[in-house]
């Protein structure tokens, strides 16, 4: 019996320590509004009141009943690779269902402007630096936001869609399964032959200049052919940019769409990018 009695205080100590750690990390879902645009966000706040903020943006899920799950999962994915545990993470549950590609940038922008201008008052904190990070369509979102508002740095993993003309032509020719992005555009404007400009202006290839903050692009070179088809052109256009802040590319052989979360090299680059701007 004596060993068990001796072990009890130690077990109690670790349980108390666990409780203290959990209470120092607050997680809440909040509906915010900025300029009359509403969007849900998930906030993961560490202890302390002077905080750097990492805003993260999920990939495509198509239906809005999956948005909250995607926002929470994306928060966890980025939290797992983030070395600095003293950053507040804000995951933006931007909508998708029945919206044309890019129309949800307004909700993402509202979240960013809320963090910039209202989070301090609403949460009782001091916001220091603000970073944006996105995966897939979330990478599309943060790249576009980087042409609109200055931040302290942006990370985009496998951003897309890069080229809606190419992608939607494949769908029109039954080469790949139909997607909501192309179907919605076709229903409103006609196909890529009838209205190519509409598809071009919503493609990420159309947003390759005017970056207001340094940006790191991460791309797995075993990603889907649709992504890799336009990747060299996208990279070339950005490298030719004359009014962009510093741009970095990390291309990873042997990694697919989620390279940022699976590659040790990508994780290191992600943290170095953030830490060098603290």
Give the label of every model feature segment.
Residues 24-48:
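N-terminal cap/lid segment of alpha/beta-hydrolase-fold proteins
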Residues 113-136, 148:
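Gly/Ser-rich "nucleophile elbow"/oxyanion-hole loop immediately N-terminal to the catalytic nucleophile
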Residues 50-51, 60-99:
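Short substrate-entry loop that stabilizes the transition state in hydrolases
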Residues 69, 213, 227-238:
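Short alpha-helix in the alpha/beta-hydrolase fold that links the catalytic acid
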Residues 222-226:
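Acidic catalytic loop of the alpha/beta-hydrolase fold
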Residues 68, 159, 165-207:
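Mobile cap/lid helix-loop segments that gate and shape the active-site cleft of serine hydrolases
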Residues 101, 232-278:
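C-terminal catalytic histidine-bearing segment of alpha/beta-hydrolase fold enzymes
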Residues 211, 217-219:
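Short beta-strand/loop motif that positions the catalytic acidic residue
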């Amino acid at each position: 019996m004596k060993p068990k009695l001796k072990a009890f205080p130690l077990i109690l100590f670790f349980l108390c320590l666990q409780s203290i750690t959990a209470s120092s990390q607050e997680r809440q879902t909040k509906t915010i509004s900025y300029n009359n645009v509403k969007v849900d966000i998930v906030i993961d706040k560490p202890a302390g009141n002077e905080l750097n903020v990492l805003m993260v943006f999920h990939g495509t899920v198509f239906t809005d009943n999956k948005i909250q799950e995607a926002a929470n999962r994306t928060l966890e994915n980025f939290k797992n690779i983030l070395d600095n545990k003293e950053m507040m993470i804000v995951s933006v549950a931007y909508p998708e269902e029945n919206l044309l590609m890019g129309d949800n940038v307004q909700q993402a922008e509202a979240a960013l402007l809320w963090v910039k201008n209202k989070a301090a008052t609403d949460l009782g904190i001091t916001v220091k630096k603000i970073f944006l990070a996105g995966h897939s369509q979330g990478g599309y979102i943060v790249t576009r936001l980087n042409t609109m508002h200055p931040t302290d740095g942006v990370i985009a993993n496998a951003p897309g869609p890069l080229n809606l003309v190419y992608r939607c032509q494949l769908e029109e020719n039954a080469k790949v399964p139909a997607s909501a992005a192309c179907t919605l555009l076709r229903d409103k404007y006609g196909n890529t032959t009838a209205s190519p400009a509409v598809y071009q202006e919503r493609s990420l290839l159309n947003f390759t200049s005017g970056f207001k903050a340094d940006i790191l692009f991460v791309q797995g070179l075993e990603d889907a052919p649709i992504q890799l088809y336009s990747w060299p052109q996208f990279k070339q256009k950005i490298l030719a940019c004359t009014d962009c802040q510093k741009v970095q590319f990390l291309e990873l052989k042997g990694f697919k769409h989620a390279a940022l979360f699976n590659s040790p090299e990508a994780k290191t680059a992600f943290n170095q990018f953030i830490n060098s701007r603290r």
